[in-house]
Amino acid sequence: RLRLLKAADLMDQKTEQFIETGMQETGSTATWYGFNVHLAANMLREAAAMTTQIDGSLIPSDVQGNLAMGVRVPCGVIVGLAPWNAPVILATRALAMPLACGNTVVLKASEACPATHRLIGEVLHEAGLGEGVVNVITHAAEDAPQIVERLVSHPAVKRINFTGSTKVGKIIAETAAKYLKPVLLEL
């Protein structure tokens, strides 16, 4: 919880760096990037607050003398694929709750804003999340299909979170289905 709260504070402190980097990469306005950082920092705070709400539960059993329990455990590695058009908000959203639930994450950065997405990873590392907990992958646009296939097919990856176009979302959904992996799509 404390590391996510620290990451939120660091993100706020680095607002100017996010604005400068984002404007250079996508040409958007300072106001838009400032809003992105503010909302993303608050998403980290919300995820931090959720860490105290994650618990198991007792489930009524119809078998006399038996007790059923629901236990929540981390899934493992979660892949987030975030777009360029609201890069700080959407990448942070893909990472925050999986981290709060004890998972590790891989963010496949958008080819249009790799430095902005890399900054998110740097903030989380600086906040104290250990090596390998948050991983940011950048690549050339022409390598995207192979990168996505490798990420989705990797046996350590347990869930995929994608925000982007319907065309690419369909490809990711088909690939995830081939490996029987749950995918969350915002198209």
Spans of model-derived segments:
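N-terminal Rossmann-like NAD(P)+-binding subdomain of aldehyde/semialdehyde dehydrogenases
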Residues: 1-66, 126
